[in-house]
Amino acid sequence: LQKARDAQDRAQLERIASQHSAAADKQANDAQAQYWAALTNSALAEVAIEVRDRTQARAAAEAGMKYAERSVSLKAEIAEYHRILGTLCGQAAGAIGGLGALKYGRCALDEVNKAVDLDSKAPMNYVSRGVGNYYLPAAFGGGVELAIKDFQKAIALDGRAAEAHLWLGVALRKANRNAEARKAFEKAVELNPARVWAKQQLEKTPAQ
């Protein structure tokens, strides 16, 4: 799954998501099966956003949300289930954009905050919250400064978290801190050289 995500192989991600979705449909009371369907649809949505296919991103995110909601209703005590639901809400918000994003923006932050409350030591919980803050405007409780703090917290917990360095770079660039953004992208590429999107972000970020 990560290999296909890193390579932006949408055809493979579509196959994987479709297999796990079919399995989850047959095992409606299996929280883990629901989670895997949510996770694989989230990976597909992530790459669709990266290649600017908003239609597919929204469809995959909304499909995944259905499974994530089911996994949370079956086992509400598992932080990772809340994180993936929040991530999918954030992806749907990012795909829709504008005022339409508000429909999912609150769900993104509420669910990821629940994940952080349940497990405050998991770096990916802060990465997901940071992505939610990145897409939600400051006027609605998000914003790039909060996002930067979340990504820095994830890195403090795990300095080898490539995704945290990658998203820190994206947020720093949005804050017009290009030199720092480049350093973050360079670290992300060093930690995960297979990640196509990280290389693309580095290439398009000016030195100053």
Language-model segments: residues:
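N-terminal leader/linker segments that initiate helical-solenoid repeat arrays
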Residues: 1-46, 51
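Residue-level recognition of tetratricopeptide repeat
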Residues: 5, 39, 46, 87, ...
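Helix-start (N-cap) detector for alpha-helical repeat units in TPR-like alpha-solenoids
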Residues: 31-32, 79-80, 123-124, 162-163, ...
